[in-house]
Amino acid sequence: MAAKGAREKIRLVSSAETGHFYTTDKNKRNMPEKMEIKKFDPVVRKHVIYREAKIK
């Protein structure tokens, strides 16, 4: 049986407080800190910073 993977699913939540989010996964061993990426928010129609949050 294979070992459990190091990748964990995360949610990237918009910093513009619109409620919009992206889902992705990341490798916890290579990147233990919280992820911050600048992506497009279609609600405000601008590029904003998306911060990592746990999937409920």
UniProtKB/Swiss-Prot annotation:
Cell membrane found in the keyword field: no
Gene3D superfamilies for this protein: Ribosomal protein L33
Listed InterPro entries: Ribosomal_bL33 (IPR001705), Ribosomal_bL33_CS (IPR018264), Ribosomal_bL33_sf (IPR038584), Ribosomal_zn-bd (IPR011332)
GO biological process, alphabetically ordered: translation
GO molecular function, one term: structural constituent of ribosome
Any Gene Ontology CC annotation: cytosolic large ribosomal subunit
PROSITE patterns: RIBOSOMAL_L33 (PS00582)
SUPFAM superfamilies to which the protein is assigned, alphabetical: Zn-binding ribosomal proteins (SSF57829)
Keywords annotated in UniProt: Ribonucleoprotein, Ribosomal protein
Similarity field: Belongs to the bacterial ribosomal protein bL33 family.
Listed name of the protein: Large ribosomal subunit protein bL33
Organism (species): Actinobacillus succinogenes (strain ATCC 55618 / DSM 22257 / CCUG 43843 / 130Z)
Gene: rpmG
